[in-house]
Design a protein with these regions (language model features):
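Start-of-helix register in tetratricopeptide repeats
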Residues: 12, 46, 80-81
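"A position-specific structural signal for the A-helix of alpha-solenoid helical repeats
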Residues: 16, 50, 83-87
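Short coil turns that delineate tetratricopeptide repeat
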Residues: 42, 76-77
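Secretory-pathway glycan-assembly enzymes, especially type II membrane glycosyltransferases
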Residues: 95-306, 310, 314
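A donor-sugar binding/catalytic signature common to diverse glycosyltransferases
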Residues: 121, 365-414
Length: 426
């Protein structure tokens, strides 16, 4: 554990960095770093003041006033800066834009399948917070389109039902204004349009608040954890934990195509009639991202051993993995108890979705089917810092009623971090 003095110094440096970001107009980065300081136990009033300043810039005086109260509680005496923030927060804001013709288009952010779904879930919450009709369109930048698909094909609807009745054709050719201004009627379904680099890149969520344009377009990820702080008090998900927010939004919007549900039920009827533990093992690019996973590998086997008595001693093991060496390891250890789907596997350090020789549509179907089947098992062991494991966990709780005793996630959660580094433009 870091010594207290070193931790305080680190937090002061983070607040200084966030203050500089705010001075450049990068208020979402500033707010995100301030949240990280507070999540680590930092007690700097300046962190709360940065949050208040951000809230005022996106027309959320309710959030600003709450942050100001926290800042004042940490100060020994009143500060002029805090008083100035309070005066601004108490100034009546201009009316919020209203009307039925307000849309939020959610593009792919061109990462892994469940990372893209994670992105969609967050932006669906943004649509609810901002009162916009959502439309998910995974266009030419999606890694999960069929190789033969061209033009305006929507890969999202290859896997899931539409999240609303709105179609791209209903939005275009009406003279509607767009934000960010890099978007227009003609380029909504194209490949990359500066999601990570260039003007109006790395726009995550807060820039969409209080916009007057009829159409907002998202092509960059915002962690659900960061978004939960901005849920209005009157919203059904206000103050709910991140896991509950995900599962609520999934129940409302995430509807896999009937063909996949039928296939998952058929597989379960054939292979999962006896007690089965689903085990999701990551390798390839996740090993590169997180480093040596050997310690986690040992914890997997401990978790399987702890779950086994609950299911008769020697349950079946459904191995869900993209990592070819894992199959050999599990078969050697557990023998014919192991069930493995036919999903594509690799021994390379490059994720399957980044390997150009593979067909994205097929990979998407495989990883979706793996998750749906795993969620039909009796228990689960996964890597918490993986969207695949995270969504299997949510699906299993919704499908099979798993609780923490039956769904073991190893390590810190991928949905428990703010990932402020994603917003850094330099």
């Amino acid at each position: 554990m870091m010594p207290l003095a070193a931790q305080d110094e680190r937090h002061a440096g983070m607040v200084a960095y966030a203050t500089d970001a705010m001075s450049r107009g990068e208020y979402e980065l500033a707010e995100r770093v301030a949240r990280e300081v507070l999540a680590e136990g930092g007690r700097l009033p300046e962190a709360w003041e940065l949050i208040a300043e951000t809230a005022l810039r996106v027309s959320r005086p309710d959030i600003a006033l709450g942050a100001i109260e926290m800042a004042e509680a940490l100060r020994a005496s009143p500060a002029p800066a805090t008083a100035a923030l309070r005066a601004r927060a108490l100034t009546p804001p201009k009316p919020s834009p209203a009307g039925n013709d307000r849309y939020h288009i959610i593009r792919s952010w061109a990462q892994g399948f469940w990372s893209d779904v994670d992105h969609v879930m967050g932006q669906l919450l943004v649509a609810e917070i901002t009162g916009r009709k959502p439309l998910v369109h995974w266009g030419a930048n999606s890694r999960f389109r069929d190789a033969t698909e061209t033009g305006d094909a929507n890969a999202w609807e290859s896997f899931f039902e539409p999240v609303s009745s709105v179609k791209i054709a209903e939005i275009t050719d009406r003279g509607l204004a767009y934000f960010p201004p890099k978007w227009n009627d003609a380029n909504l379904t194209i490949g990359d349009n500066g999601a990570f680099h260039g003007p109006h890149s790395r726009i995550a969520a807060l820039d969409f608040f209080a916009r007057e344009e009829a159409v907002t377009v998202s092509d960059f990820h915002a962690p659900m954890l960061a978004l939960t702080h901005w849920i209005p008090r009157e919203h059904r998900l206000h103050s709910k934990p991140v896991s509950r927010v995900f599962m609520d939004l999934m129940q409302k919007y995430l509807k896999p195509k009937r063909e996949f549900l039928t296939r998952a039920d058929t597989f379960a009827g054939k292979h999962l009639s006896k007690p089965t533990i689903a085990v999701h093992v990551r390798g390839s690019d996740k090993a590169k991202e997180l480093g040596d996973l050997s310690a986690a590998a040992a914890l997997y086997h401990q978790a399987i051993a702890s779950l086994s008595p609950l299911m008769g001693g020697k349950p079946k093991i459904l191995l869900v993995t993209d990592w070819a060496p894992a199959e050999a390891e599990y078969r050697a250890r557990y023998g014919d108890r192991v069930i493995v789907s036919g999903a594509t596997k690799t021994s390379l350090s490059t994720g399957l979705h980044f390997q150009p020789s593979l067909i994205g549509r097929n990979l998407g179907e495989e990883v979706l089917m793996d998750a749906l089947i795993a969620a039909r098992c009796h228990a689960f062991v996964g890597l918490a810092y993986s969207n695949v494991s995270a969504f299997i966990g949510y699906l299993g709780r919704l499908t099979k009623g798993w609780d923490d005793s039956r769904a073991i996630q190893i390590g810190p959660s991928i949905h428990g971090v703010y990932n402020s580094f994603l917003l850094k433009r330099s």
